[in-house]
């Protein structure tokens, strides 16, 4: 499995479990690089995948924020 998918799955699981609650800012790319021992490009690819699936939203200059699970469920069921 590609490294970015491993990061994606771990972060998605944290969001679903509430470890990373709605409106919380994700750790910085640098922090995630150190935590997962991955390159910046790999971390960005994982974050892009999270955004594509509706787990997070990027706010330029502010960071990446977790979306509410209700919004995610509505996106896929509504």
Give the location of each predicted region.
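A short alpha-helical element within helix-turn-helix/winged-helix DNA-binding domains
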Residues: 25-36
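Residues in the helix-turn-helix
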Residues: 42
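HTH-adjacent hinge/linker in prokaryotic transcriptional regulators
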Residues: 3-7, 17, 21, 34-35, ...
């Amino acid at each position: 499995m590609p490294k970015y998918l491993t990061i994606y799955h771990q972060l998605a699981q944290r969001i679903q479990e509430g470890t990373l609650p709605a409106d919380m800012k994700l750790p910085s790319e640098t922090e995630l690089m150190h935590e997962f021992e991955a390159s910046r490009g790999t971390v960005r690819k994982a974050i892009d995948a999270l955004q594509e699936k509706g787990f997070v939203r990027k706010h330029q200059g502010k960071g990446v924020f977790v979306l509410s699970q209700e919004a995610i469920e509505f996106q896929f069921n509504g």
